Amino acid sequence: MKKFLSLFFTSVILSGMCGICEAKDMRFVQISDVRYSAGSDNQTFANVIQDVNKQKNVEFVVFTGDNLNKPSTDDLDGFIKEAKKLNRPYYIVIGDKDVNKLKHLSKVEYVKYLKKHIRKYKPETPSYTFIKDNIVFIVADGAKDVIPGTNGYFKEDVLTWLDNELTKYQDKNVIILQHFPIIPPSEKEAYYTFKPEEYMKVLAKHNNVKAVISGHFGVNNEQSVRGVSHISTAGIPDYRIIDVMDADTPNPTIWAQLKQAE
């Protein structure tokens, strides 16, 4: 009987250890505020791409807005050509500098251009969802293309959609990717998001959001608010390597590592 119990407890311990061993980690890279300008020196962007390509175990790269210096297809075309040099899949968020209906580059036109010029680019709208290693990534669009400005604005339909997506994936860990921070990383009122409290009400209804990753302010900052990591990254040459450790557990650890390309 003692031998049986000994074997039983040994089996339980080994099973638990295997469970720990199988805990998954995943890594992605955030690049923000590239501000690509056709006809200008964009070597810094090229250096960042080269640096990111050297990093190991990166699942994907996300560009979190202000990808262009101004809303033009020339800038967008140059940005895409450089981004295509990445050796990992990449996703694109729209920022305030990227779109302007009066400049013939609305958000609809921007997405159409991406789909036309990037093979296998799947998103059909500025806001979209994708899944990597059982983690749900939600791209939330807060840009304005009718009256562009530096203040982010997450419209009611975007917040309703976000609420529905968080409900749909309530049993999964979620990371939100966007250009405009909800929690200001510095005191720049001209960059604040309009009515952030409405966005925070949506977050308060759910416990599956682990991080909100953004750019826009030109500031590197990390802070935790109500259990959610709010990570803001400045423009190039800075970028972040973000590790989600124990990604398949209810409480993963988010580790954001700041890097700078030379």
Predicted regions and their residues:
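Positively charged n-region of N-terminal signal peptides that target proteins for export
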Residues: 1-4, 189
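Bacterial N-terminal signal peptides
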Residues: 8-16
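N-terminal active-site segment of His-dependent metallophosphoesterases
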Residues: 20-78, 125
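Active-site-proximal segments of metal-dependent phosphoesterases and phosphodiesterases across multiple
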Residues: 23, 144-153, 169-214
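Alpha/beta-hydrolase fold active-site loops
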Residues: 26, 59, 127, 134-135, ...
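Active-site neighborhood of phospho(di)ester-bond hydrolases with catalytic His/Asp-centered motifs
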Residues: 30-32, 60-66, 90-96, 140, ...
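Short, glycine/acidic-enriched loop or turn micro-motifs at the edges of active sites
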Residues: 36, 69, 144, 182, ...
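Extended active-site neighborhood of metal-dependent phosphoesterases/phosphodiesterases
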Residues: 73-163, 168-169, 198-208, 222-257
